[in-house]
């Protein structure tokens, strides 16, 4: 549980004596040198809890500049590579539901022994994302630069792309009353489908395509980011189903494993529906029961 304010000499219900060492966790096999899982009594609510790393924090050769985003599985930071003098994006493994940041050391630790299994799964999934990105080499896919261990967890650094997400751009356009032109949409769709052509030829499915995971560079080039849900075609039978309402395909929404290129293509269609209308389509599982979503031809856009 997150730490709270208030300091005491000993945690409630304890004698103030040091607790026995915690049992081995097995995480050492994934992250050698990782601090041991804390005993429950060691997690007394003594300090103000801070989830994100502060600006100025050093991670290997990188210095944290600011927080870019925070989700259920981790935090992304804008950082500077002090050796190469360039900005990068760093992703930190920090599954919110089963871990916390030690307020004294900054280390990420499972909440308790019961959360250890979920934390281990999240860590393996995080490293799998890094390995997937390392297999890919395409101008429309974010490049991974390095993977490293710090603060008892895993990080990876990616290229920093100067651009804005389609989510932000779409919202901005609809707020101001502007629209994409037909030629702009055709060009964007063509370039995005070429990225998917390469990705699927590599036998990898993204599984989480949506406006927020597509960046548009200053030159107008789409770049696919966030491969946390991506899986190799041969590993889908062991993949956990992750969904985003409105953008996930019917097979994903129903928790099935028959994921394929068609799944990503459905999400692309949903993405462009959102760009045209200003909102995502109805959830796939709802549409399967009763598809009352009006076609674009009936919507004034």
Feature names for model-found ranges:
Residues 200-216:
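Catalytic-loop of the protein kinase fold
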Residues 151-165, 169:
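Conserved short submotifs of the Hanks-type protein kinase catalytic core
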Residues 166-180:
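AlphaC helix of the protein kinase catalytic domain
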Residues 147:
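Activation-segment/catalytic-loop signature of the eukaryotic protein kinase fold
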Residues 246-299:
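C-terminal lobe helix-coil module of Hanks-type protein kinase domains
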Residues 103-135:
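AlphaC helix of the eukaryotic protein kinase fold
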Residues 188-189:
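Activation segment signature within eukaryotic-like protein kinase domains
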């Amino acid at each position: 549980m997150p730490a709270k304010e208030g300091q005491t000499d000993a945690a409630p219900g304890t004698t103030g004596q040091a607790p026995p060492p915690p049992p081995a966790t097995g995480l050492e096999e994934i992250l050698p040198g990782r601090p041991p899982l804390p005993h429950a009594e060691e997690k007394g609510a003594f300090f103000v809890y801070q989830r994100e790393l502060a600006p100025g924090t050093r991670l290997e050769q990188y210095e944290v500049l600011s927080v870019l985003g925070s989700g259920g599985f981790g935090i992304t930071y804008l950082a500077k590579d002090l050796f190469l003098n360039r900005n990068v994006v760093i992703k930190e493994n920090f599954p919110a539901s089963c871990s916390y940041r030690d307020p004294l050391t900054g280390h990420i630790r499972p909440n308790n022994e019961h959360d250890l299994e979920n934390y281990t799964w999240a860590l393996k999934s995080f490293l799998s994302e890094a390995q997937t990105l390392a297999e890919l080499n395409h101008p429309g896919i974010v490049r991974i630069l390095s993977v490293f261990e710090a603060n008892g967890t895993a990080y990876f650094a990616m290229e920093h792309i100067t651009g804005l997400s389609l989510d932000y751009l779409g919202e901005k356009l609809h707020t101001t009353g502007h629209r994409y032109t037909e030629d702009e949409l055709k060009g964007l769709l063509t370039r995005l489908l070429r990225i998917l052509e390469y990705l699927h030829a590599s036998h990898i499915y993204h599984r989480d395509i949506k406006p927020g995971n597509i960046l548009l560079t200053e030159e107008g080039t789409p770049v696919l980011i966030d491969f946390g849900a991506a899986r190799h075609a041969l590993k889908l039978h062991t993949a956990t189903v992750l969904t985003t309402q409105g953008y996930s395909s019917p097979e994903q929404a129903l928790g099935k494993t028959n994921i394929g290129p068609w799944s990503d293509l459905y999400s692309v269609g949903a993405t462009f529906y959102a760009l045209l209308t200003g909102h995502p389509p109805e959830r796939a599982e709802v549409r399967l029961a009763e598809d009352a979503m009006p076609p674009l031809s009936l919507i004034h856009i």
